[in-house]
A protein has these predicted regions:
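Basic, Lys/Arg- and aromatic-enriched nucleic-acid-binding interface segment
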Residues: 2-60
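C-terminal catalytic core of Y-nucleophile DNA break-rejoin enzymes
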Residues: 7, 86-106, 117-141, 158
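Catalytic-site neighborhood detector that most strongly recognizes the C-terminal catalytic loop/helix
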Residues: 12, 86-89, 185-212
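Conserved tyrosine-mediated DNA breakage-rejoining catalytic core shared by Y-recombinases
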Residues: 17, 26, 64-109
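Short, basic (Lys/Arg/His-rich) helix/loop patches that form interaction surfaces
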Residues: 30-38, 111-117, 136-185, 191-192
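Key DNA-contact positions within bacterial/archaeal DNA-binding proteins
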Residues: 61, 133, 192
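The DNA-recognition helices of helix-turn-helix-type DNA-binding domains
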Residues: 70, 165, 174, 190, ...
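C-terminal secondary-structure termini that scaffold catalytic or DNA-interacting sites
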Residues: 109, 113-116, 124-127, 207-215
Length: 215
């Protein structure tokens, strides 16, 4: 007999947990503190917001691999168009929310002499494994200081939890009116994955589920 597959909810932030994470990240950046000799600056804050508002994976192949030359600022100022060349699901072009435009502008200001071929995040680390590990340490420090290592569901929060929070929030705030096919394509995932790990784990009304076109 076929054993039913049980899908566990992905580790994600609640709205309050995400706001607390941002608040503590800002406060720590203002203190000039160092974590194992590495300054914790507003660049970590920008990283957090960018993951949420680009729906990208916080991995070497995705957000840590993005260079300035991969980004096109759309004329309306409402979105960035990002070419993700080495993503988990292959090459894709994604569009961001307006908040990502603001964060990208701030990143350019803290790296005013950047070249098109430079990475947008922590470009001083040419080895992107080093960049990833460094950011993970800084992120974990913020989680500890904010008492957010474990979320309200008892799950461990990690950088990847930002992506899960982003997708859940986008679905929830749309009240079921978002086109899940476009969202899945933009996030480099599939509709079935959205259904299994996000929509089926969320409290949605029957009308919202119908709007999401989930069969």
């Amino acid at each position: 007999p076929k054993i039913p597959r049980k899908d566990n909810p992905r580790s994600s932030f609640t709205e309050d947990e995400y706001k607390k994470l941002l608040k503590v990240a800002r406060e720590l950046a203002d203190t000039g503190i160092k974590v194992r000799g590495i300054p914790l600056t507003m660049e970590l804050y920008y990283f957090i917001v960018l993951v949420v508002h680009t729906f990208m994976r916080p991995t070497e192949g995705e957000i840590f691999n993005i260079k300035h030359q991969d980004i096109k600022e759309l004329k309306n100022g409402e979105s960035l168009e990002i070419s993700c060349i080495t993503g988990k699901t292959g090459t894709r072009v994604l569009n961001t929310t307006k908040d990502a435009v603001e964060m990208y502008d701030k990143l350019k200001k803290i790296h005013p002499d950047h070249k098109d071929s430079d990475y947008i995040l922590f470009p001083q680390y040419k080895n992107r494994t080093t960049a990833l590990k460094t950011v993970n340490r800084l992120f974990n420090y913020v989680l500890e200081e904010a008492s957010l290592k474990i979320n309200t569901q008892g799950k461990t929060l990690v950088p990847y939890s930002l992506r899960h929070y982003a997708l859940r929030t986008r679905i929830r705030k749309s009240k079921g009116k978002i086109n899940v096919f476009i969202l899945a394509k933009n996030a480099g995932t599939s509709v079935s994955q959205l259904e299994r790990f996000y929509i089926n784990q969320m409290e949605l009304s029957e009308d919202e589920r119908k709007n999401l076109l989930i069969k």
